[in-house]
Amino acid sequence: MKYLPITLCLVVFLSGCSFTENTKIAPPFKIELYETVDYKKNTVFDLRLQGGKPTIVNFWFPSCPPCIAEFPKIDQFYLENKNSVNVVGIQLLGLDSAQDGQDFVKEKHIHFAVGADPLGKVSVNYHIKVYPTTVFVDSQGQIAGHWQGEITIEELDQQLLILQNKAN
């Protein structure tokens, strides 16, 4: 058990970054959110109720260095695009507590929706094996693709254009 954090970090670093396209229905989920700049604590994020906008789902945890490195980029992307896309961060619990996640988003003044996956069901349903992983869900609720590893603002912008073009 003491080697689990090291193993997870190695999986993340050795996997590199990659994008994969998908076309299956995104498994629905509801998570209770942490308090962020734009969201109140205990608000529920329900993927099915996202108003026909595409949704970007980021799977992360606080002791994951690439997860932490990409969070400010995702937040900047969210601030620039929040009228046209939903963004939600889903924290893996186990290595870090929910309190660790809440403390991180508060300390970093994160704006987008962030919450925990207490039983790991969302991560399992999305087949998450590498952290961070970012999943792109189109406005019809289909998974358009996913990115494994740290993501850049440029890649987020490119994926948003693809999601928007797919809707037209």
Regions inferred by a protein language model and the residue ranges of each:
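Short pre-active-site segment immediately N-terminal to redox-active cysteine/selenocysteine motifs
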Residues: 53-55, 60-63, 130
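A generic structural signal for alpha->beta connector loops
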Residues: 53, 84-85, 111-112
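A short beta-strand-turn-helix
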Residues: 30-55
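Thiol/disulfide oxidoreductase modules built on the thioredoxin-like
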Residues: 103-110, 118-161
